[in-house]
Every structure is written in structure tokens, then in C-alpha cells.
Amino acid sequence: MEIDVKLTASPKAKPQDESNLGFGKRFTDHMFIMEYEGGKGWVNPRIEPYHRLSLDPASSVFHYAQEIFEGLKAYRADDGRILMFRSRDNCRRLNRSAERMCMPPIDVEFNYGCLLYTSPSPRDKRQSRMPSYA
């Protein structure tokens, strides 16, 4: 599966004090989006600049919503590396939750690769290529 990557033209200012980020207050410059189509599964994966979402008032999410939340926090170690605690396991937990909610599973390895791609590197430089998974 290929992924379309569009990086932001105006990155957010980096926090002055990375040791005091808090939770749910700072967000990345990008977001990972993928749709589900019956008979095809998860399709159209892409990374886009962070933006607001627009929803039709008739969207079924407002009337028959199912949701899964799997929080994951990344932080910078003293040596400059970005650390995430068991992020691949986080993708697996998402699938266990999806099964319980009768929702379609994600491809763990593909989504893990997207997670690594959207996470900042020690000097905010992205890899030159996005991993591709069949």
C-alpha cells in the first residue's frame, strides 16, 4: 500500500521547554488519515498538514458512533532520541479494541510505519522515503 505524504509549509514553533509538555496540549504538524470502504478495507492512507475536520451534520458518527482511543506519547531523551513506549503494541491494542467494537482491524505493520514517519526525529528531519507495505 502506498501512502501520499504532504508536509506542512509552515511548521509550528517548537516548545521552549520540552520537559514540560503536558498531555493533550501540543500536537504534531501532521495527521495520518485513512478511510474504510466495505469490500476493500482500509484505503487511501495519507499524511497531511494538521487541519480542522469538517463533518456533515447527517454524519452517522453523530447518531450511531463507535470509537476507539489509544493514546501514545512521544518524548525526547537526554541524548536527543525520540522515545515512544511500546508503540507497536499500541497498534495491536487498537486492533483488540476494534474487534470488541465490531470494527475492521488496521494493518499493524503499515500503521506502525506511518506512526514512525509522523514522529519527529532528533533534529526534525524526516526520512527521505516512507516505508511501503504490501
Segments (PLM) and residue ranges:
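Hydrophobic alpha-helical segments, chiefly the membrane-spanning helices
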Residues: 128-134
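Residues forming anionic-ligand binding surfaces in small-molecule and nucleic-acid pockets
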Residues: 71-75, 82-101
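Conserved phosphate/anionic-ligand binding catalytic regions in large, soluble enzymes, centered on
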Residues: 58-72
